[in-house]
Amino acid sequence: FNASGVATRALSNVKADQVIDQFTHRRAMSHLSKGRVVIVAGGTGRPFLTTDTAAVNLALELDCDVVIKATKVDGVYNRDPARYPDAIKLDQLTHDESVARPDIKVMDKAALGLASEQQIAIIVCALLKDGNISRAARGEAVGTIIR
């Protein structure tokens, strides 16, 4: 992000002080108030709470408009593209569709339901495609948007 001109700070819920600053609400809000993109790694460190749900919870806590889920696929498909070569990529979905459709498996239903209830958009894009996350953070069309 920083290299592409987007001011960014990474924080972690898992203690790793030599590598990354620890997440605190105050630290994250300070970075956000300065116009920086905040990336939070490490989930919540709590059992029975997926990283997907943790991401949506953090978005709520930090009053974010969008969650970017960078993953191994380049968006949401109507079925598993690894198993079905004829799977169709969906450019956008409503929250209701993402929760109701059993074929949507890129995120857990608890996270999708919480995002739906709180009207937080989710962008699903490929982690390893160069520039994807930066483009998503700048509001450019990438992957699939759920809103």
Residue ranges and their predicted role:
Residues 1-147:
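C-terminal catalytic "cap/lid" subdomain
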